[in-house]
Amino acid sequence: MYNMVSLFIVAVLLLTYANVEGSDVTGGFPVNSNNCIYPCYSTQDEIQCEEFCEKLNGRLGYCRRDACYCEHLPESVKQITNSKTFDCSNGPWDLSTV
């Protein structure tokens, strides 16, 4: 019984540490000049999102809430950090509109 309790406590501590470590990752949804997000639904979109984020000097890109999300984007990149504020969706993935 003591071993089970000890294991549970260690697991909770590890999960808490992992959650705290992940909470300071900055990122956002890149937008074009019209504040439109880039849609992201499928595996192909996710690959495109990852490449797009790298071009924007972010480290990781993936689909989140049906939009392209980039982690570690520079502050100079226009982005939305609150996913509740999507106004429109951009069709083509075009860096010239960022």
Curated annotation (Swiss-Prot):
Q: Per the record's keyword annotation, is Ribonucleoprotein included, yes or no?
A: no
Q: Where is the signal peptide?
A: 1-22
Tell me yes or no: is Disulfide bond among this UniProt entry's keywords.
Answer: yes
Source species, domain of life: Eukaryota
What main location does UniProt list? secreted
Q: Extract the Gene3D superfamilies matched here.
A: Knottin, scorpion toxin-like (3.30.30.10)
Among CDD domains, the record links this protein to: neurotoxins_LC_scorpion
Q: Which UniProt keywords apply?
A: Disulfide bond, Ion channel impairing toxin, Neurotoxin, Potassium channel impairing toxin, Secreted, Signal, Toxin, Voltage-gated potassium channel impairing toxin
Q: Where in the cell is it found?
A: Secreted
Q: Which GO terms describe its cellular component?
A: extracellular region
Q: What does the record give under GO molecular function?
A: potassium channel regulator activity; sodium channel inhibitor activity; toxin activity
Q: In which tissues is it expressed?
A: Expressed by the venom gland.
**Cross-referenced Pfam families, in alphabetical order?**
Toxin_3
Show the disulfide pairing: 36-88, 40-63, 49-68, 53-70
* Family according to the record: Belongs to the long (4 C-C) scorpion toxin superfamily. Sodium channel inhibitor family.
Report the domain remarks: Has the structural arrangement of an alpha-helix connected to antiparallel beta-sheets by disulfide bonds (CS-alpha/beta).
Protein purpose? Probable sodium channel toxin.
Protein name in UniProt: Probable sodium channel toxin Ts27
- Source organism per entry reads Tityus serrulatus
Source organism lineage? Eukaryota, Metazoa, Ecdysozoa, Arthropoda, Chelicerata
